[in-house]
Design a protein with these regions (language model features):
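N-terminal Rossmann NAD(P)H-binding glycine-rich loop of SDR-like oxidoreductase domains
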Residues: 1-25
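Conserved Rossmann-fold NAD(P)-dependent oxidoreductase catalytic core, especially the SDR/UDP-sugar
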Residues: 6, 26-28, 34-36, 76-143, ...
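NAD(P)H-binding glycine-rich loop region in Rossmannoid oxidoreductase-like domains
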Residues: 29-95, 99-102, 190-193
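Non-catalytic, hydrophobic alpha-helical segments
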Residues: 70, 151, 181-185, 201
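Substrate-positioning beta->alpha
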Residues: 93, 133, 172-187, 197
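Flexible, glycine-rich beta-alpha linker
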Residues: 118, 143, 149-169, 201
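Glycine/proline-rich active-site loop of Rossmann-fold NAD(P)-dependent oxidoreductases
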Residues: 120, 160-165, 188-197
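Short-chain dehydrogenase/reductase
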Residues: 198-206
Length: 217
C-alpha cells in the first residue's frame, strides 16, 4: 500500500511511517522543510518537499497520483498565529482532498481534533480559530466524494502507546499518546468499513482493534 502523508515530519506521522514501513507498505511523507527529509528516510518513508500553503491542486496531485490512500496529519503547530491555523489546518487539508479527488484516490484519513465543532466563532483566541479551522476542514472533506474517515483525538502526549482507547462518536475530555493515534490511523487504513465515519478518541481500556470494530457493528 502506498500512503501519502501530509505533515510527514509531525510526531504522529513519524510513528505512522515507521509502522507502515515495518510491514512493507510505502509511506510517502510531504514536508515543507528539506532539512526534515533525513528524519523521514530514517523512519522508512520516502519524502517529498512541498509547501502545502503555497501549492496548487495540480502540484499536490503529482505526489498523490498512484497512492492507495492519503492521510492529513499536518498542523501549523504550537506558537503559530491564527492565520496559519487557517492556511494549514483548514486550507491544506482541503487542498489534499481536492488533489485526491482529482487523481482518483478515494481513501482519505483526516487527523482532526477533539471538540472541533464546539468552538466560539466570535473568539479571536488562537485555539478557537484552530478548532474552527479543523471543523471547517472536516465539513469540506465530508462533502467530497471520498472514502473519508475523520479521527478526532483528545490531548496529545508523548508517552508510549498503551494500545487501549475510548472511542465513540463523542467521548469525554481526555488525552491519548501520539503513538496510539498512529496505530489507529494504520488500522483504519486497513478497514474500508470505517469510511464515512467520524469519531473522537482518548485513552481508555478497550484494545484498539475492538474499539474500531465497534464502529461498524
Amino acid at each position: 500500500m502506498r500512503v501519502v502523508i501530509a505533515g510527514g515530519h509531525g510526531q504522529i506521522a513519524l510513528h505512522l511511517e515507521r509502522m507502515l514501513a515495518a510491514r512493507g507498505d510505502i509511506p510517502v511523507g510531504i514536508v515543507r522543510n528539506a532539512a526534515h527529509v533525513a528524519d523521514l528516510e530514517q523512519a522508512g518513508a520516502n519524502a517529498v518537499v512541498l509547501d502545502l500553503e503555497h501549492s496548487s491542486v495540480a502540484q499536490v496531485a503529482e505526489v498523490v497520483t498512484g497512492a492507495d490512500a492519503v492521510v492529513f496529519s499536518a498542523g501549523a503547530g504550537p506558537g503559530s498565529g491564527a492565520a496559519r491555523k487557517l492556511t494549514v489546518d483548514r486550507d491544506a487539508a482541503i487542498l489534499l482532498a481536492d488533489a485526491a479527488a482529482a487523481t482518483g484516490v478515494r481513501r482519505y484519513v483526516m487527523v482532526s481534533a477533539y471538540g472541533a465543532d464546539n468552538y466560539d466563532p466570535n473568539s479571536p483566541e488562537v485555539y478557537q480559530v484552530y478548532l474552527g479551522a479543523k471543523s471547517d476542514a472536516d465539513a469540506a472533506i465530508r462533502a467530497r466524494d471520498l472514502d473519508w474517515t475523520i479521527v478526532r483525538p483528545g490531548g496529545l502526549t508523548n508517552t508510549p502507546g498503551t494500545g487501549r482507547v475510548k472511542l465513540a462518536d463523542s467521548v469525554g475530555r481526555g488525552s491519548i499518546p501520539r503513538e496510539d493515534v498512529a496505530t489507529i490511523l494504520r488500522d483504519v487504513l486497513d478497514l474500508p468499513s470505517t469510511a464515512g465515519r467520524q469519531f473522537e478518541v482518548v485513552g481508555g481500556t478497550t484494545p484498539i482493534p475492538d474499539a474500531l470494530a465497534s464502529l461498524v457493528v
